[in-house]
Amino acid sequence: MTKAELAALKHGDWEEHSFRIRRTETRYRSEDGTYIYEVKEFPKTAAGVRTVVIPKAWFWIEEKIRSSNPNEEYIFVDAKGKRMTTNCFRRRLERVCNRLGIVKKSPHKIRKTYGSILLDNHVDNRLIMGQMGHTDIRCTETHYHRNRRSVQQKIQIVSAIPELSGVGAK
């Protein structure tokens, strides 16, 4: 999911171990040059209307997120109860990376990594498209897939191809 979809999640969007994406946040500049963040009651594209499933290993975080703020309309709010914007997510992630002493990652890099993990594990294309909110798997393959294999893993893959296995080579 995108950070704009995350910023627009409401408690009613949760289902058992999944959540429905039905809206997104948009950002634009006002006449005085300040950014305005608004939730639109529709996603960026038709493919954005979807249900995203949560892997079993992450069920624990679902309950933690849901119970952390049960009385507000939006799931992710700041200390004052105000809905967190996409910029809040980006800044928080940056602070966490700094605290951990790791290279800064953007929410979009995390999304790209998730898409790559799904593709690398040969997940069904329809499921990938649903999780990512894409109408065409080529979008995920072209813009989100990064080769995460080590050189040794690449050597093993290429060496396993019968035509390249070296049978008969000197």
Model-derived regions, located:
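Short, cationic motifs built from Arg/Lys/His that form the positively charged side of catalytic pockets
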Residues: 1-4, 50-52, 62-66, 111
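C-terminal catalytic core of tyrosine-transesterase DNA break-rejoin enzymes
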Residues: 1-5, 92-99, 109-135, 157
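Short, charged phosphate-coordinating catalytic segments
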Residues: 1-27, 126
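Catalytic-site neighborhood detector that most strongly recognizes the C-terminal catalytic loop/helix
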Residues: 25, 132-157
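C-terminal secondary-structure termini that scaffold catalytic or DNA-interacting sites
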Residues: 27-49, 56-58, 80, 158-170
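Active-site/catalytic core of tyrosine-dependent DNA strand-transfer enzymes
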Residues: 53-102
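Catalytic tyrosine of NAD(P)H-dependent dehydrogenase/reductases that use a Tyr as the general acid/base
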Residues: 107-108, 144
